[in-house]
Amino acid sequence: MLRQLFLASLLVAVPAVCGAQGSDSAPIRPFTIRVPDAVLADLKARLANARYPDALQGDGWTYGTDVRYLKALVDYWRNTFDWRAQERRLNQLEQFTTQIDGLNVHFIHRRSKQPNALPLLITHGWPGSFVEFTKIIGPLTDPAAHGGRPEDAFDLVLPSIPGFAFSDKPREAGYDPVRIAATEAKLMARLGYQRYGVQGGDWGAIIGTQVARNDAAHVAGLHLNMCTAPPPAGVDSSAGLSESERARLKVRDRFQAEETGYQQIQGTKPQTLGFALND
C-alpha cells in the first residue's frame, strides 16, 4: 500500500532521445524514467522538516488523515522506500511518449508475440497511474505462459491520462473526458491499430466509454469495472426498493455527505490544492 502511494508521487523524468515512427509523421519516442538526484535530495529534506498539525484527541480519520498514520507514512517514505529500485523496475516496461494536440502523452506499449492478438487500450483512474496495471501485462500479452490460451492474447496500450504521471498536463481549461478520449483514439491510430478493445475503471471507465462512443468504427468492444446508472432527473431513486436496498441507499447518502470533501475541492478549486501538494 505504502509503496503504491509513492510510485505516483515522483513525476519528474527525462525521455530518451531517439524513437520509432507510428502510422503518421509524429514521432513516438522511447521514454526512460530518470529522476534527478537533486529532486530526491529535496524530497528527503522536505520530509525531514515536515510539520504536523495538532490533532483532536481520539479523532482518528474523522476529520481527515490520521496524524499517526501520516507520521508513519513519512517515516517509511524517508527512511525505507527505495525510489531507485522502483525506477529500475518500471524502466523494464516498454515506455514511450508522443505529442498529440500539443501534449506529450506517456504510455506503455507491449506487443504480444501472437500475430492475431487484439489491441487493448486500458485507462487508469484517480488516484492511480499505469503502475496499477503492471501485474496484468504479462498474463494479457502472453497468456500461454500464465496458464491461459495463446489465442486470448492482447497487445496492450496503457496511456497516462494528461496531467497524470509522465503525460503533460493540459494548458487550458475544459480538457474533459471527451477530449481525453479523442487523444487516446488518436494514439491508437498513430500506433497503426484499426480495431481495438477498450477497458477502464474510475475515470478510465468514463474516458473509455467516450472512446467507444466516438471511435465506434474502430472499437471492437468495451469492458468497464465501474458502471454507473443514476436515475433520470426528477425520479425518486428509492421508489420500488426493498428495505435492504433502501438501507444501502442511506449508506451511499452518508458517504456522499461525509466522505466526498476531496471531490468538492478538486472539482471546484484544484489550483488551491495543487499549490499545497506541489510544495
Predicted regions and their residues:
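Short coil/turn linker and secondary-structure boundary residues
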Residues: 35-38, 65, 175, 268, ...
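N-terminal targeting or regulatory segments adjacent to alpha/beta-hydrolase or S9 domains
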Residues: 2-89
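Catalytic cores of eukaryotic secretory-pathway lumenal/extracellular enzymes that build
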Residues: 71-277
